[in-house]
Amino acid sequence: MTAVPPRGPLRPSIISPLVMSEGVAHIVHTGEQDRRGVLIELRLDPGARPAAVRRGFLRLFTDVFGTAGPPRPVLVAKHYMRCMLTPDEITRLVRGGDSATIAGAQRALGLIHHVWPDLILRAHLDRSVSTIKADAAIRTFDSAGAGVVWAVLDSGIDAAHPHFAAHDTLTASAVAKLHRDFTISSSPGTGQSPLTDAYGHGTHVAGIIAGQVPLDTTTLRIAHNQPTAQDLPQWTLRTLPAGATLSGVAPMANLVSLKVLDDNGNTLSSTMIQAIDYVRTVNSDGRDLQIHGVNLSLGCPWPPAEYAAGQSPLCRELDLLTGTGVIVVVSAGNEGAGGTLEGPSGDVYGQLSTITDPGNAATAITVGSVHRYRPHTYGVTFNSSKGPTLDGRPKPDLVAPGERITSAGTGQLIAGVTPLAPAAGHPPRVARYIEDSGTSMSAAHVSGAIAAFLSVRTEYIGQPASVKKLFCDSATDLGRHEFYQGAGLIDLMRALSST
């Protein structure tokens, strides 16, 4: 007679089904013994000490696998561990070993709350600044962002770009020692500087938030797409109109580069959580916030079978971050055109609820995209992700310019763009600018606008809920449905005038 295994060693809900699935594209796989990235949420019951729970989990890991097993867990936040495990190893871990005893399972379940997939996330101004009335606000209220610090969780920021030199955007004493690289390196200790940007996305986003074109315009080269006679796009150079400048929305704000995207524009949920935890740690060192807001111009499709909208580990960590007084701005995603349905007659129908994570986070300010200077005419960008969330909440919260936005260019973003290629006779520090599109750029406009607002309405620092409500209440209605435009187009001038 075959012995019946003891009941209870595995709770059905403790392991995400997605973790055990084969061939899931948005989970990191090493190719080594079918190991995949998992995010283990530790069980922190009331009264439990996080350090003691972490030590208990590491002892469990060693007892189950020994010293020659899978790679050691990596702490990414006080109650999250990043692990690389095979499906069999995951099962063994939550059972407390190979024997599958009730005692072993109870030990494991006393330490592990849930095993989540470590999802892969990807990266999603001269005329657009006036669209949100940032230029008028600077003239009227002197809202240039001075004294405000914003963290950019992205592919890094190229500190060598002249755009960030005039106002010490990255080198002021308030931020000089705060930059960090959280990207995963195959060789520990060989991480790249957070003030370099091979991918180029982070520098472009950062340039929309803060910084300013150098006064010496002889070093300025701006590339934009100009249709040819055959209606094909071609990169050409353009000049600034007389009296115009290229500036971030909050030119005098300071930025903290938290590099989370690798050179291909990818990152992991665990990496994001690690960076978010770092912001909390920085802000816990003293009475006043050192980092006032964060910008996340990235995201990924999320599996609704795994958790309700806004309840993923990453979304929950962002909600916790806003609870500490930090304003969180997130791009809605560029999936608005990816969910089209074709009817029997060949007609195409749009599909709603395409907001990507972490744009589903309830307390985050989630931003969609509109045309850079004619938003009333063209409305919401066709591929800007639409609401509502799948649990019925309205998203996005706001829209901002996101089409063909000119900002600082570097790395892969300008590679192959002939007009920006180095040439004989160029000064050594040419300021190169280029157009890019997406809700990544829209989120950066909102981050810059809020940084500008906080620089003159300092009583709102540390009040993310009040700031979100104020900007939504003061937004300009574009006459589109709230699932497309949210509260409307951000209006910095009206937000300042209403307080």
Question: Locations of the language-model features?
Answer:
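Active-site-proximal beta-strand/loop segments in catalytic clefts of secreted hydrolases
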Residues: 43-44, 117-119, 152-156, 209-212, ...
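Residues that flank catalytic or metal-binding motifs in active/ligand-binding sites
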Residues: 36, 79, 111, 160, ...
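Autoinhibitory N-terminal propeptides
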Residues: 1-79, 87-136, 465
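Mature extracellular/periplasmic domains of secretome proteins
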Residues: 96-99, 103-109, 138-147, 197, ...
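Active-site-adjacent substrate-recognition loops and nearby beta-strands
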Residues: 129-132, 138, 164-165, 272, ...
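Active-site core segment of subtilase-fold serine proteases
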Residues: 134-252, 284-290, 297, 413, ...
